[in-house]
Amino acid sequence: ISCSLVGSEMCIRDSIGTGKIAKKLICILRGFGMNILAYDLYPDYNFAREHQVVYTSLDELYHNSDIISLHCPLTEQTKYLINDYSISKMKDGVMIINTGRGQLIHTNALIEGLKNKKIGSAGLDVYEEESEYFYEDQSDKIIDDDTLARLLSFNNVIVTSHQAFFTREALANIASTTLQNIKDCLL
């Protein structure tokens, strides 16, 4: 059985700033009437006011969110942001989505949370040890990573290969920015 987004408490977690991706998602989710909670080291209060986002502490965010979506870089502060301790503070049945970096989530803690039903579901566009399994076709190989194999065995977990940069537009933007940076250095 699925859940309704209407009226859900949604947490957008971005540790360095409510960045472009999180802001786009917030705009989409507000269309469903979702209440948005956010934690950010550098809150964008103008954006929050305009889009009815409530900045809060991590503890309040964990305690009140039905859905936790991670959109932040991997830093010393964010490594294993989702772990046994943070999961214990979350609502029962919470949905966790990670499109940021794999090591934002301690995978074994996620698995335990899924097994004991503390975590109701997970959507992972990144994985802690993804380098061997993503970015090239591995469909003819056996997965020898027992942790990844266990994650894939859950019917309430979706794992996709992180391909955020791999579009024509993104590659053109990367090339354009690189060329501009070179020009700026030479001038």
List where the protein language model places each region.
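Phosphate-binding beta-alpha-beta segment of Rossmann-like dinucleotide-binding domains, i.e.
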Residues: 8-9, 24-27
